């Protein structure tokens, strides 16, 4: 109930209480407030006990689904699905674990390995005399339709 109240707020209330109520009556007021809280807690506990004794079996029937809902709300999504659909047998969902799937060899990986092996088989060896064949470079300037990079159609 008072989980959001910090020590700073409590200190501020005590200082305001000292100013408004006065230092003579403040300790007595604190004792009265404490006694009222304890009396309220005792009354609530007594009411719970009397309801449990009068309607215990009916409350148990209501509590079962509520506790089950509370259990599901505390679970992770994977655990809740496993419990509801597979009777706590998580081996079915473990088959879809991405880490396990990626650790195993896949068809795509096998295809890439095959291509790499084929590419390594097609490697051309260099001549032993040290001469290297230079690749021909296709330069657009060498083409018959080279016009210098500007066309009249670009301007008009």
Curated annotation (Swiss-Prot):
Its domain of life?
Bacteria
Q: Which GO terms describe its cellular component?
A: TAT protein transport complex
Signal peptide span: none
Q: Which GO terms describe its molecular function?
A: protein transmembrane transporter activity
Q: Which GO terms describe its biological process?
A: protein transport by the Tat complex
Which keywords label this protein? Answer: Cell membrane, Membrane, Protein transport, Translocation, Transmembrane, Transmembrane helix, Transport
Report the subcellular localization: Cell membrane
Disordered, as annotated region: 100-156
Query: Transmembrane stretches, by residue range?
Result: 2-22
Q: What is its main location?
A: membrane
Q: Report the membrane topology from the UniProt record.
A: Single-pass membrane protein
For bias type Polar residues, the affected ranges are 113-122
Which family is annotated? Answer: Belongs to the TatB family.
Q: What quaternary arrangement does the UniProt entry report?
A: The Tat system comprises two distinct complexes: a TatABC complex, containing multiple copies of TatA, TatB and TatC subunits, and a separate TatA complex, containing only TatA subunits. Substrates initially bind to the TatABC complex, which probably triggers association of the separate TatA complex to form the active translocon.
What the protein does comes down to: Part of the twin-arginine translocation (Tat) system that transports large folded proteins containing a characteristic twin-arginine motif in their signal peptide across membranes. Together with TatC, TatB is part of a receptor directly interacting with Tat signal peptides. TatB may form an oligomeric binding site that transiently accommodates folded Tat precursor proteins before their translocation.
Please give the name of this protein: Sec-independent protein translocase protein TatB
Q: Which organism is it from?
A: Corynebacterium glutamicum (strain ATCC 13032 / DSM 20300 / JCM 1318 / BCRC 11384 / CCUG 27702 / LMG 3730 / NBRC 12168 / NCIMB 10025 / NRRL B-2784 / 534)
Q: Name the gene for this chain.
A: tatB
